[in-house]
From Swiss-Prot:
One of its GO terms (molecular function) is rRNA (pseudouridine-N3-)-methyltransferase activity. Homodimer. It holds the Pfam family SPOUT_MTase. It comes from Gluconobacter oxydans (strain 621H) (Gluconobacter suboxydans). This is Ribosomal RNA large subunit methyltransferase H. It catalyses: pseudouridine(1915) in 23S rRNA + S-adenosyl-L-methionine = N(3)-methylpseudouridine(1915) in 23S rRNA + S-adenosyl-L-homocysteine + H(+).
């Protein structure tokens, strides 16, 4: 699995937390970081889209992270991840730049998901997606990390 993101995650607590979760995921969640583009908003989105899609093989199963995507709960994401993995295609999670994803990325994506209605810094989105993929794998393997219900 690969996470392809615009921007660099600097050393610090966000990177440490990302690495903590990414290191638990099997197969490993690797990262490709792409330099942010410059220009008008539309030009940035167009250039970022070309870079993001260019970092994915033609047969990639692309999961775009976008505020307009579906908002699965953890159990539903676990089902989705299982289905994606069963496809045999390499899974690529795409995170756009500050201006969001170009429509060409949304159109190419096999799935578009959102982490909710709140706006998250791009560096935290990396941590959140790594944790949720780890959680999904824990759910799918019966690991006790995820607790669906809590006693009253």
């Amino acid at each position: 699995m690969k996470l392809v993101a615009i921007g660099r995650l600097k050393a610090g607590p966000e990177r440490e937390l990302f690495e903590r979760y990414a290191g638990r995921i099997r197969p490993a969640l690797t990262v490709t970081e792409l330099a942010p583009s410059k220009g008008s908003v539309q030009e940035q989105k167009r250039q970022d889209a070309a870079a993001l899609l260019g970092a994915c093989p033609d047969n990639a199963l692309i999961v775009a992270l976008d505020e307009g995507g579906k908002t699965p709960d953890s159990l539903r994401l676990a089902e989705m991840l299982s289905r994606w993995q069963e496809s045999g295609r390499p899974i690529h999670f795409l995170i756009g730049g500050a201006e969001g994803l170009d429509s060409s990325v949304i159109q190419r994506a096999d799935s578009v998901i959102s982490l909710g209605k709140l706006t998250w810094p791009h560096m935290l989105v990396r941590v959140l997606i790594a944790e949720q993929v780890f959680r999904a794998q824990a759910i799918n393997t019966g690991h006790p990390y995820h607790r669906e219900s809590r006693p009253d």
